[in-house]
Amino acid sequence: MSEPLAPGLDPGAAQPAIAGPAAAASPAATRAPIDLETYYTEAGMDYRAWSRGFNMHFGFWRAWMNPFALERMLERMSREVFARLALADGDRVLDLGCGVGAPARTLVAERRVTVTAVTKVEWQIAMARRLADGTHPLGSVEWLLGDYTALELPPASFQGAFSIEASCHAAGAAKEPFVREAARLLAPGARLVVADGFMKKARIPRWYSSMLGYMTRSWAVERFADLDAFTACLERHGLAVEAVEDVSYRIAPSVLHVPRVTLEFLLRELMLRRRWLNRARWGHVIACLIAPFVGLGRAWFGYYLVTARKRL
């Protein structure tokens, strides 16, 4: 859930313009996000309140699904991504930003594939291995500690790659370091599927920029990708864009669970366990409460599934 929602403002890239008087006053433009490892080390375990399976992303709803069954919608998001990869048995698949591995576990439980799941947060590897203990998957997972923009893996060695609410942690409006490495690692004809939030317009109101800025800083996101810049970057690196699907309304039922889950979490931590939250955890909680309001800014922001295929 990251994630997984703001133009977090890469100093080296073109910035979204803030509608209204030109001023450097926006907090989103002046404060850096929390460090990724710090965020997930201090607040990562709180995702347990969101998903018993540690699905660290929003869900995908279809008309036949119960909108009150949050975990099923979270798992459905993973399956929607996998369906777009069009995998075959024996394929090697790359999970770019795996968290504690819920999507990877879902994939290998159902398909005879080999997944290399990458995270730069060390404790997530240990947790992923513990959560996989006792399962009997059809496929297999290699848990890899590393930076998904600079992996020591051979080129053209994967038949598919996906990233669910993790590409947002890469730098820049186009997420070029992320795209470049994915393109290097994919075999010709292989697909990349990205599920994430994207900025739709360059100009945004100042009040909306403030909300977005708080969320990006609190969720260790420099900025969310600009949709047009991201798709152009894919093409530039030899990944032909096959589909850009706005699924914002598909994730809305899961987003509506956020206030309930957050308030239950606060009640449990503050009132029952009498634990005070550190700065990273408070930032995460407040950002979660802002999320439904950010999602209403449909003119400026959307949640997309982007599918691209490496040219032959």
PLM feature segments, named:
Residues 176-191:
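A short glycine-rich, Lys/Arg-flanked "PGG" loop and its adjoining helix->strand segment in the class I
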Residues 58-60, 68-89:
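Conserved alpha-helix/loop element of class I SAM-dependent methyltransferases that forms part
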Residues 92-94, 100-150:
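Class I SAM-dependent methyltransferase SAM/SAH-binding core
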Residues 198-221:
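Short, glycine-/aromatic-enriched active-site segment of Class I SAM-dependent methyltransferases
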Residues 149-161:
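A short acidic, Gly/Pro-enriched loop at the edge of an enzyme's catalytic core
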Residues 245-312:
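Conserved Class I S-adenosyl-L-methionine
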Residues 222-238:
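Short alpha-helix
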Residues 2-49:
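N-terminal auxiliary segments of SAM/dcSAM-dependent transferases
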